[in-house]
Regions:
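Extracytoplasmic beta-strand/coil segments of soluble accessory domains associated
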Residues: 70-109
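Flexible loop and strand-edge segments within Gram-negative outer membrane beta-barrel domains
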Residues: 228-234, 248-303, 318-350, 378-379, ...
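Short acidic/polar hinge/loop motifs at secondary-structure boundaries
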Residues: 109-135
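Outer-membrane beta-barrel signature, preferentially recognizing the C-terminal barrel domain
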Residues: 169, 174, 278, 282-296, ...
Length: 577
């Protein structure tokens, strides 16, 4: 029986872990084994890549656990957390986030509505055993969206001994009244490993150190220093099976993550003080709110034979996001929906992913890897409002990577990749807006420009990535790395075809269907000194982006009724250092 307790000024994390093994070990031998395996494994992983690598295993994740994976990693240099209220967060690497970094779990890139500033990461933080963070251009291996880096969640490794094991974890925070827990049970028998986990968290309204805020030039009161209706919860379940026998290994994972979070009504639409009065309940979730359910099924297949490693990753994801708000319309001709009248926005994203990798070790000096990826997406919409159109998206790419090891101290790596992508966007006509603009006296040219909230778009993209780097260990405890890489990113559908008021940010966001893909060059170097229990890391990087896509304020009000400033997707050269 092992008990772990970590406390802090803002929160408490308590973990109870029990492990019944068929083969018994002494405490001394177990501790020694963990130290030796962890140290050699981390050192080997750092030497395998020319990019800056951070590797975190279960002990680190437990010590810094917050109930939120991104917040757990926010103290890592170069990694930041964009917090969305008390419960959800989005990751950033070296200042890049959203669709400019990739999050991978069990070999499959996480695909949700990550373009939204108020959309969190749908991953159970309790269910993470090991995390690897690659900083820098990673499009070579991971394709588009990995310009800034990758957060890779690795699967649980078997201990190669028959055992029953389990974990019970409790989480509590004084700020926002967070309470949560997780229960995991598993069995390892011969070549099989099976694990089941259930997790749940609840948190109250968000506490702030002020009594008023300014919203749309109006002073809005904050009663009890709590942002009303910002409570939320998440409920997650997952099952994982792993099989390893001689030259073959595989795993299958099924997970479902459900999250629900309220929106502060004082910053939703036109300011209304009456909606902010204290209801004496800091945990209820009323309108407006958002909810998302993320279902994911993945499998990894791997075969080893005579210096050849063939692996495949296949996955299906269904991200169902809804935003609810009391039915309101600025058009007297728009009729309230008969079913679910308060469901404002619906996004249903289906994603099919597959990848194949072939690794060849022709000698002790040369190693080659070839790979192919494919992804198919289909997004459907619903609700009484419009923000993003329906679309279909297809991407595929192939790469080649070669590593030459001169000796045990020096290795050089280089590779190239080419991707093709196609996106088909469905048109969306808004007759209610047309009638409204006629009544307001707008010119016919303006009316026709806004008749179609989304125009039909069928575009194809192609681009390449490349990378070259060196890893040098001149002496024990010293590690030097340098890498130069070119990466790219296909424009997102929100950048091409969004056209509506997004209540999460309360601005009119309008896409541009003529945008081309982003390209970027990045050079980074690092030096690591490891001496006994001390480790010193010095790293630097410089980035240059061509056709960097961003939301540009137009300096004019939207023609949509009761809207706000208009922001349009635009592209420009930019440099980050």
């Amino acid at each position: 029986m092992r008990i772990r307790y970590v406390s802090g000024t803002l929160g408490m994390f308590f973990t109870l872990f029990s492990n019944a093994q068929v083969v018994s070990d002494t405490i001394k031998s177990v501790d020694l084994s963990e130290v030796v395996v962890t140290g050699s494994y981390r050192h080997a992983q750092e030497k395998k890549t020319t990019l800056t690598l951070e590797l975190f295993q279960k002990d680190y994740l437990n010590r810094h656990f917050t109930g939120n994976l991104v917040q757990t990693l926010k103290n890592v240099p170069g990694v930041h957390s964009m917090d969305i209220g008390a419960g959800f967060s989005k990751p950033m690497i070296r200042g890049l986030g959203f669709n400019r970094i990739a999050v991978s779990e069990n070999g499959i890139k996480q695909e949700g509505q990550q373009w939204g500033a108020d959309h969190g990461l749908e991953i159970d933080a309790f269910n993470v055993d090991e995390v690897r963070i690659l900083k820098g251009p990673s499009s070579l291996l991971y394709g588009s969206d990995a310009m800034g880096g990758v957060i890779e969640i690795l699967p649980l490794l078997p201990q190669k001994e028959n055992r029953f094991f389990g974990e019970a974890a409790l989480l509590g925070k004084s700020v926002n009244g967070t309470v949560g827990g997780s229960l995991m049970l598993g069995i390892e028998k011969n070549a099989w490993l099976v694990r089941v986990r259930f997790s749940e968290q609840h948190y109250g309204d968000y506490h702030v150190p002020v009594d008023t805020i300014v919203y749309l030039t109006q002073l809005v009161p904050v009663y009890g220093r709590k942002l009303k209706n910002t409570a939320g919860f998440e409920r997650n379940v997952s099952v994982m099976g792993d099989y390893r026998k001689r030259f073959y290994q595989m795993n299958i994972a099924v997970s479902n993550v459900y999250q629900k979070m309220g929106f502060f009504p004082g910053a939703h639409g036109i300011p209304d003080i009456s909606r902010l009065e204290d209801d004496e309940n800091s945990r209820n979730i009323e309108l407006p709110y958002s909810k998302v359910n993320h279902l994911k099924v993945t499998t990894h297949q791997q075969y080893l034979w005579n210096g050849i490693q063939l692996s495949g990753d296949f996955g299906y994801q269904f991200n169902h996001r809804e935003e609810w708000s009391a039915f309101h319309t600025h058009y007297d001709t728009q009729v309230m929906p008969a079913k679910d009248p308060d469901r404002e926005l619906v996004f249903k994203l289906h994603t099919f992913s597959s990848s194949l990798k072939l690794r060849l070790s022709s000698s002790s000096s040369w190693e080659h890897m070839a790979g192919w990826n494919m992804q198919i997406q289909k997004n459907a919409i619903g609700g009484y409002s419009f923000l993003l159109p329906e679309y279909k998206r297809f991407t595929t790419g192939a790469f080649w990577l070669t590593t030459f090891r001169l000796d045990n101290q020096l290795s050089v790596t280089g590779g190239i990749r080419y991707d093709r992508g196609r996106i088909d966007i469905t048109a969306f006509e808004d007759p209610y807006l047309v009638e409204y603009l006629h009544r307001q006296g707008y010119e016919e040219e303006v009316i026709q420009a806004y008749r179609w909230r989304s125009y039909p778009v069928d575009r194809a993209y192609g681009n390449y990535s490349c990378s070259a780097g060196v890893v040098w260990t001149p002496a024990a405890g010293h590690l030097l790395k340098m890498n130069v890489g070119r990466s790219f990113r296909l424009p997102g559908v929100n950048e091409l075809a969004s056209n509506g008021v997004h209540h999460g940010t309360f601005r009119h966001e309008k896409g541009d269907a003529t945008l081309s893909s982003e390209q970027g060059w990045q050079i980074d170097a690092s030096y690591t000194l490891a001496y006994k229990k001390m480790e010193l890391v010095v790293s630097s990087f410089a980035s240059w982006f061509d056709n960097y896509i961003y939301l540009r304020p137009m300096g004019e009000w939207s023609v949509l009724p009761h809207a706000c400033l208009l922001y349009t997707s635009d592209a420009a050269d930019d440099s980050l250092r």
